[in-house]
Amino acid sequence: LTVRPPYTLEDMAKDALGVLDALEVDRAHIVGVSMGGMVAQRVAIAAPQRVLSLTSIMSSSGARGLPEARRDVLRVLLKRPASSEPQAVVDHYVRLFKAIGSPAYPVPESDMRERILRGVERSFHPVGTLRQMVAIISDSSRAEQLARIKSPTLVLHGRADPLVPFAHGEDTAKRITGARLVGFDGMGHDLPPEPVALML
């Protein structure tokens, strides 16, 4: 069964290049996190002459045969909030962020709830989230195309990532000539302040 998403990761890469065009930026440092890392890879593949450097964070090459997300995490990810009421949505995302978060850098639940509520109040668009998931699932593997990337590349990945396991970062780095891989002990599929400070 072939899934045709409303938009693809390649479409998102074209949008990113369109933003650079609109800003009259010829070349840029391209950074992407999770799905954004996949889009950043697509940008570097499609327009290598526009990329000063590539940083792919907790992302994947899309190669087949890599370890899958933990099943308990997938169950939480694929579950829907009990209702569209803000409190139910916050409860859902608290469960999700606890499931994918960094075991070495736990976030107090009160802080997590406050941050999630601000995000929900600013913009909650579950159909858009679903479209993004479909775009990821339907994207072809970038594995063979990554060899075309010649820009300096940094691959950053949590060693405790339960959603996109560390092996995905290792695979991405080995496929890009000269790429440097940095793993962070105890970091899951989020961006705790301590590892982020080291990234910067």
Kindly give the residue locations of the regions a language model identified.
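Conserved acidic catalytic loop of the alpha/beta-hydrolase fold
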Residues: 10-28
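Residue in the alpha/beta-hydrolase core beta-strand immediately N-terminal to the catalytic nucleophile
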Residues: 29, 52-55, 147
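Gly/Ala-rich beta-loop-alpha elbow adjacent to hydrolase catalytic centers
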Residues: 32-36, 40
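Flexible "cap/lid" loop of the alpha/beta hydrolase fold
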Residues: 45, 52-84, 128
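Alpha/beta-hydrolase
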Residues: 73-144, 148-151, 171
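Short beta-strand/loop motif that positions the catalytic acidic residue
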Residues: 149, 155-157, 161
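Acidic catalytic loop of the alpha/beta-hydrolase fold
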Residues: 159-164, 189-190
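Catalytic active-site module of serine/aspartate enzymes centered on a nucleophile-bearing elbow/loop
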Residues: 178-200
